[in-house]
Amino acid sequence: MNTCTTIRNNWQLDEILELFNTPFNDLILRSHLTHRQFFNNNEIQLAALLNIKTGGCPENCRYCSQSAHYKTDLQKEALLDVENIKKAIQTAKNSGADRFCFAAAWRQLRDKDIEYICNIINLIKSEKLESCASLGMITLDQAKKLKNAGLDFYNHNIDTSRDFYSNVTTTRNYDDRLASLNNIYEAGINICSGGILGLGESIEDRAKMLLTLANLKEHPRSVPINRLVPIKGTPFENNIKVDNIDFIKTIAVTRILMPKSYVRLAAGRKDMSEEMQALCLFAGANSIFYGEKLLTTPNSNCDDDKNLLSKLGIKTKEPVLLNSQN
């Protein structure tokens, strides 16, 4: 097996489908060896995530409890005040997180909220943590302002393939997502972008989603892979759970396509066994969301995470990507 990996932005769909069809042991061995070329194989990034504005989103994403289009048990909440955000940042740091992400249930970032967002970025940077914002669609001018405030990453997931996208939402289109990703890139902010498995997509849709990400001008520095958490009241509440092996294979393919990216286990990890998480980490995942709540869905218990990482001999990393693409 050739273990020398070249960074590419010219992947073809048939190549990625071939990876998905590779026998499991061969695939995760290749992805593991790829991972070792670019990362400490026994190191992981812990990312905390805070919802600064909950519910009432005008988008109709069919998986989301925060959409105003569906009747879920979620209670709508206004923007958090800065003091509560400051406490959350300090709590995350004290718990061992080296990256702090914050999100708002908005269609797009509004100019009137820029100062408020920049204040949050300053609070995160004052604690010497990596910062990541997920605030919806963003213009180039807005992205430049967040870059100047010190933002390290901007999250903007593409969710699935272009072909399947209209089955997920109809209030925006795929090109809207890609335009925002380009604005983030042009502003010099590191891109965080991934997808969700379990929306009803095919293996080919997963391959096409990863193809889009891997063939961007520059690979996202962070790629969150979510497993759908079905929410009662949403159109996807009865979706079939993604097969565990299929999920692990997607992690492996992601690592092979984007060798230098942080591959993050995101939503749905609470229902994964220790053995499944261990295989995901072996296959190339090297970041997890840390904390007992992930936006509006439950996450793994912090003590359980610490225990698992200890058993695996995995240590946490120090923040290094401070407002830089290098």
Curated annotation (Swiss-Prot):
It comes from Ehrlichia chaffeensis (strain ATCC CRL-10679 / Arkansas). One of its GO terms (molecular function) is biotin synthase activity. SMART domains: BATS, Elp3. [2Fe-2S] cluster binds at residues 101, 132, 192, 264. Its EC number is 2.8.1.6. Residues 42-266 form the Radical SAM core domain. This is Biotin synthase. The gene is bioB. [4Fe-4S] cluster binds at residues 57, 61, 64. It catalyses: (4R,5S)-dethiobiotin + (sulfur carrier)-SH + 2 reduced [2Fe-2S]-[ferredoxin] + 2 S-adenosyl-L-methionine = (sulfur carrier)-H + biotin + 2 5'-deoxyadenosine + 2 L-methionine + 2 oxidized [2Fe-2S]-[ferredoxin]. Gene3D superfamilies: Aldolase class I. Homodimer. It comes from the Bacteria. HAMAP family: BioB (MF_01694).
